[in-house]
């Protein structure tokens, strides 16, 4: 079969159609549903309401609260992941003793399922019977409300997210560091540039494209967080740690309000798109400068 042989279409189009059906149909169906009033329990006939679901959602204080909570968790956790990940990647790239062991240990958290990590964290941070509070009580400190007080619960979720996903950042940044040309550093050493000057003027600017990509990927993933929150706090206390995806789960799988949930999903998509566009727009001048 040659490159221009028409028979190739018999192999390409079926696969392409399957992909389109699997990906496009649910998207179109969900968009259509977002303009309908549709409930499964109690079962009610679908009724066109236009932008009614979107208006109701945007006027719901709970939506803005969970959007703010999701943003807080995403930005704080990703920021910490990047700072810690860059520090560890720089250390590993410097060929420290026991580098292979360190790489293995640092990558372990990423290999564990988020639900399993959240279950372990919930047991460890249990405010009454958790090992951490038991140890603190043994040392004479009072029990801390790790999962029962808003600020502590948010902090606990962020710490767990940082612990699990910093290895991904380390892996990506370390790969980027190992592609940087050695001759640039040799020239800087001849100019008696300090380690800080080399990092500021060489390493960080040259690593910027990788950094932008890594932070962008982690931001998108952090906005989709549900498993860690669902298992550790269930969105509580109250709704203080509820995220956008958990809110959608509550509306879709507990209240069976499909139209409202579909509208929420598309607003979530818009939020992610806007954040991504703003993020890339802010960093584009720096990327062009250091290209």
Predicted regions and their residues:
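A structural signal for multi-pass alpha-helical bundles of membrane permease subunits
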Residues: 4-291
